[in-house]
Structures are given as structure tokens and as C-alpha cells.
Curated annotation (Swiss-Prot):
Residues 159-202 are annotated as: Disordered. Keywords: Cell cycle, Meiosis, Nucleus. GO terms for cellular component: chromosome, telomeric region; nucleolus; nucleus; pericentric heterochromatin. This is Meiotic chromosome segregation protein P8B7.28c. InterPro entries: Stc1, Stc1_sf. Residues 164-176, 187-201 have a biased composition (Acidic residues).
């Protein structure tokens, strides 16, 4: 059988995949080799490790299927179990300033920048323990009543300033209207003065003509 003929030529695979990029523990001619014997390098510790050192999610990133064949990715970006970040089992509560277990926080509070435990959340809603009601709770992001008074004072001051600015703008508009009307009246008076000057010149010219005829 002529394997060099065009009939038996293997089609080219995509450029981002390599058919022989796998590194097996045994030789290439060893029997029973499969994908589980493949070694992959971790992108963080830069160590070549087997399938036992990777999770299923990370291991699925190393291979793909092309025309029914399992093909390894040329440069897979995978992280071994040792280098993967661990899940936090405790969270710092910003309300009571204590480190508590993750089970004491609701799922919504676990993903915010200022997490609060369930006890502190209930205490703010006036549904918590009586011991917590004895100590006045101050939200570090909102402040106490004095901060609220300051905010009200600042808001009132800004309102007064805005009203004063509106009054000043109204006065300036009236002044502009008056000045514009005065300019128009002045221009009309100047136009009347020009007409009177022309009439006077006409009278002088007519008088000059009469005197010349008499002579």
C-alpha cells in the first residue's frame, strides 16, 4: 500500500494545535498510552505535572477535538491545584469590626466591598438582639446624626446660594434689557437729530439761492 499517494495524505490541522505536543511518561512506542499519561506545565510554578495535579476544569483547557481527533493545545494556560487560590473561609465585618465565618454572611453580602454579617444587618433593621441595641451602631460609610445634620446644612446652604445666583442672574437680565432699550432710544434720538440737521441745511441753501437771485 502506497501511503505517499494523495489518497492517504492526512489533512493539515489548525495552526493553534499540534498533533504531537503531548509528552508521555513512556516512550512514543509504548502500549496503552492515553491522555491521562500526558504531562502539562503549570503556568505559575512552571513545573510539568500529570492529570492528578489539575482539576477537571483546568484539564479541559489543554485539549480540543478537530475532525474527530483529540488534539492538544500548543500552549495551554492552566494552573495546578497547588497554585490555585484557596477559597476564603472568613470575612471581615465592617459593622462590628470582627472577623467571622463565611456562613454568618448572606450570599449577597459576600460579594460587596463593605460586607456585614447577618446579626449586624438585622440590628440595623431593628430586628436583632437586644444586646446590640444598647450600643449605638454607626455605619462607617453613612455616619451618625451629626454627619446627617452637616449634610442638611450643606444642602440648605447650596440651595440658598443657588437661589441667590438665580436672583442675580434675573437682575442682570433686567439690567441688560434696560440698557438695550436705552441704547435703542439713544439711536432714535440721534437719527432725529440727523434729520433736523438736514432740514436746517436745506433752509440755509434755499435762503442762499434767494439772496443770489436778488443780487
Amino acid at each position: 500500500m502506497d501511503f505517499k499517494s494523495r489518497k492517504y495524505k492526512i489533512k493539515k490541522h489548525p495552526k493553534d494545535c499540534k498533533l504531537h505536543a503531548k509528552k508521555y511518561r513512556g516512550t512514543l512506542n509504548s502500549k496503552g498510552k492515553n491522555d491521562n499519561d500526558c504531562l502539562i506545565m503549570c503556568m505559575r510554578c512552571r513545573k510539568v505535572k500529570g492529570i492528578d495535579s489539575y482539576s477537571k476544569t483546568q484539564w479541559s483547557k489543554t485539549f480540543t477535538f478537530v475532525r474527530g481527533r483529540t488534539v492538544s493545545v500548543s500552549d495551554p494556560k492552566v494552573i495546578c491545584r497547588t497554585c490555585q487560590p484557596k477559597q476564603h473561609d472568613s470575612i471581615w465585618c465592617t459593622a462590628c469590626q470582627q472577623t467571622k465565618g463565611i456562613n454568618e454572611f448572606s450570599k449577597a453580602q459576600r460579594h460587596v466591598l463593605d460586607p456585614r454579617c447577618q446579626i449586624c444587618v438585622h440590628s440595623q433593621r431593628n430586628d436583632g438582639d437586644d444586646n446590640l441595641e444598647s450600643d449605638k451602631f454607626v455605619d462607617p460609610f453613612i455616619g451618625d446624626d451629626s454627619d446627617l445634620d452637616d449634610d442638611i446644612y450643606i444642602h440648605d446652604k447650596q440651595t440658598i446660594n443657588s437661589e441667590y445666583a438665580d436672583d442675580v442672574s434675573d437682575n442682570t437680565d433686567e439690567e441688560r434689557t434696560e440698557s438695550k432699550g436705552q441704547q435703542e432710544s439713544n439711536s432714535a434720538e440721534e437719527y432725529d437729530d440727523d434729520d433736523s440737521d438736514e432740514d436746517r441745511m436745506e433752509e440755509i441753501f434755499q435762503q442762499f439761492k434767494k439772496e443770489k437771485q436778488i443780487v
